[in-house]
Structures are given as structure tokens and as C-alpha cells.
Regions:
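Structural motif at the C-terminus of the N-lobe alphaC helix and the adjacent alphaC-beta4 loop
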Residues: 11-23, 78
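Conserved HxN/HPN-centered segment at the entrance to the catalytic loop
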Residues: 19-35
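Active-site activation/catalytic loop segments of kinase-like enzymes and analogous catalytic loops
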Residues: 181-225, 241-260
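Protein kinase-like catalytic core scaffold
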Residues: 24, 46, 147, 165-168
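Conserved structural core of kinase catalytic domains
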Residues: 30-65
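Catalytic activation segment of kinase domains across protein kinase-like and atypical kinase folds
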Residues: 156-194
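ATP-dependent phospho-/nucleotidyl transfer catalytic cores
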Residues: 54-66, 81-150, 155-163, 241, ...
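Single conserved hydrophobic/aromatic residue that forms the stacking wall/gate
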Residues: 2-13
Length: 298
């Protein structure tokens, strides 16, 4: 994991003759053994150098979404030549086949006796399962690569300077090999939703194309140099994939009796499932428009 500290990204910036590198890369303080982390027997700790005159933002706007797209595309581009064997921080984190396996196991066990209520929803999800598991299948066929991705893309995981310019990507604990769909799709799952992820009124849930266009423009500007034609072609698929995946995860937990996600009320995971599945449907309807816009950027 040390390669993602002050050495790997910093060296890339030096080769690119970047200035102000100390503010554009998180620098981790090494231990006396030379490691960039310390294990106290129970937990891991890291200390990074404070970056002065920096701030995080929470607001998701077309302007901030464009900047996020540029920076995370740049982040992937700088790490594109690193070996995939870097290691998975969370195994199968964004593996759709694995998430479907979890759902099917939950359905078979029906631990909380809730299957009668959700059987029709499970059937709907299963109809699209083969299509939504395409990434893993294409990877096994050698048609789709895995790259080093951040895997937690959001506005608050970047530092900005006092003038609103992007300094660096932060919160690197989920950085690992994945499909580029992880960074592209997961950002738009949250940022492109016009409502909270647990909105009970499904009529309030729509997919925000203005956020999509801004993020896609920034991302493709900085990532198109290394993306394959298939990766670019499948970016709209990524936008569908992540609300679908999250719906599957919420539903599996609901069927299991709410054992994983913290809930605020008895039907919370069920409400979350319906909300994410509605967002998936909205994203699917927007795919032709997404494809047309991405083509215009190339």
C-alpha cells in the first residue's frame, strides 16, 4: 500500500514537472521502521502531513462535479501503469456477481421470513442480473481491464484551496484494483440522485443529467488517454450498475433481517432498496442520452 503514499503519486507529479507537489499529494509520515502505517495490535494508524489553506466541500453542483471528474480521472491516469496485484482492500467490494450470490443465498435462507413480501422485487432484479454482471464476465474473457481506482468518489474526498481549485484526492483507504466503473458509477449513484438514498417517496427520485454531463466531461478530459474503447462505451452501464448493486445489497440485508446496515426503523432497508432500484430505472432510461453526450466528448 505504500506506493499510494508520498512516493508513488509524488514521483508521477515530478515526472510531469508539476509544481506545489507537497499540496497536491497526501504525504504520510513513516514510522521508525520505515512503514507508512502503524499497527497497534488491534487497529492500523497513519499520520499524514497537514496541507495548509485547504478545505473540503460538501455541495454537489455541476461545477464541483466537473472538478471531481477531472481529478479522479487524473488520479486513475497517474496510477494506470501500476500492477493490478496491488491488492484488494475490501475483496469483492464492487463485484456484481458476488453481490448477486449474496442475494441468492439470502433468498434461499429467508432468515427473517420476508420473502413473501419481496419475491416480486427479487424477480425483477433477477431479470437484469446477467446484463448487470457483464463487467466480471468481460474481465474473465480478457476484454475488460482492472485498474487502480479510488472506489469512494465523492466531492468530500478531495481537498480544495481557498480559491476553490482542486489540490488532491484524499481518503485513500479504499484505493485498490477495480473497474473504472467504480469511480465513475459510484459518484453518480449519489451525486446524480435528486433525492436521498433512502427517500420513501419514489416520485422524488430522478437522475440528474446536468450532474452527469459535468462529471463525465471532466472525467473523460483527464482519463480518455488511457481508457479503452470498451471502457468508454460502457460508462453508461456503470451509471446503471451502482444503484442496481446497492439495491441488491440493501435487499439482501433486509431479507437477512437487517444484520449489516444500520437502520433507523423496521422497514428502512426495504425503503432503501426501492429507492435505489428506482434510481437504477431512471438511469437506465437516460442511457441513450448519456451515450450521445459521451460520444460528443470524444
Amino acid at each position: 500500500r505504500d506506493v499510494l503514499g508520498s512516493r508513488g503519486l509524488g514521483d508521477v507529479y515530478k515526472r510531469q514537472h508539476e509544481t506545489d507537489i507537497d499540496r497536491k499529494v497526501l504525504r504520510f509520515v513513516p514510522t521508525v521502521e520505515g512503514k507508512t502505517y502503524y499497527f497497534d495490535g488491534e487497529r492500523y494508524w497513519r499520520v499524514c502531513v497537514f496541507i495548509p489553506e485547504s478545505q473540503t466541500l460538501e455541495a454537489v453542483t455541476p461545477e464541483s462535479s466537473y472538478l471531481v471528474g477531472v481529478k479522479f480521472g487524473e488520479f486513475e491516469a497517474m496510477l494506470a501503469d501500476l500492477p493490478e496485484k496491488l491488492g484488494e482492500t475490501i475483496p469483492d467490494f464492487h463485484n456484481m456477481e458476488f453481490r448477486m450470490q449474496q442475494l441468492r443465498e439470502a433468498v434461499a435462507q429467508n432468515a427473517a421470513g420476508r420473502m413473501e413480501k419481496v419475491q416480486s422485487l427479487v424477480d425483477e432484479i433477477e431479470k437484469d442480473a446477467e446484463e448487470m454482471c457483464a463487467a466480471e464476465r468481460l474481465y474473465r474473457e480478457g476484454k475488460l481491464p482492472k485498474r487502480i481506482c479510488h472506489c469512494d468518489t465523492k466531492v468530500s474526498n478531495m481537498l480544495f484551496d481557498k480559491d476553490g481549485k482542486v489540490l488532491c484526492v484524499i481518503d485513500l483507504d479504499t484505493t485498490m484494483p477495480s473497474f473504472v466503473f467504480s469511480d465513475f458509477g459510484d459518484f453518480l449513484r449519489s451525486a446524480g440522485n435528486t433525492a436521498p438514498e433512502d427517500e420513501p417517496d419514489l416520485n422524488k427520485i430522478h437522475f440528474n443529467m446536468d450532474i452527469f454531463r459535468a462529471f463525465a466531461k471532466g472525467y473523460i478530459e483527464s482519463a480518455k488517454s488511457f481508457l479503452t474503447p470498451l471502457e468508454i462505451e460502457m460508462l453508461p452501464y456503470a451509471v446503471m450498475l451502482f444503484p442496481y448493486m446497492q439495491a441488491v445489497r440493501f435487499l439482501a440485508d433486509y431479507i437477512n433481517g437487517d444484520t449489516y446496515y444500520q437502520i433507523k426503523y423496521a422497514e428502512h432497508n426495504y425503503v432503501r432498496t426501492l429507492a435505489q432500484y428506482k434510481l437504477y430505472q431512471e438511469a437506465r432510461r437516460a442511457v441513450p442520452e448519456m451515450k450521445e453526450y459521451i460520444s460528443s466528448l470524444l
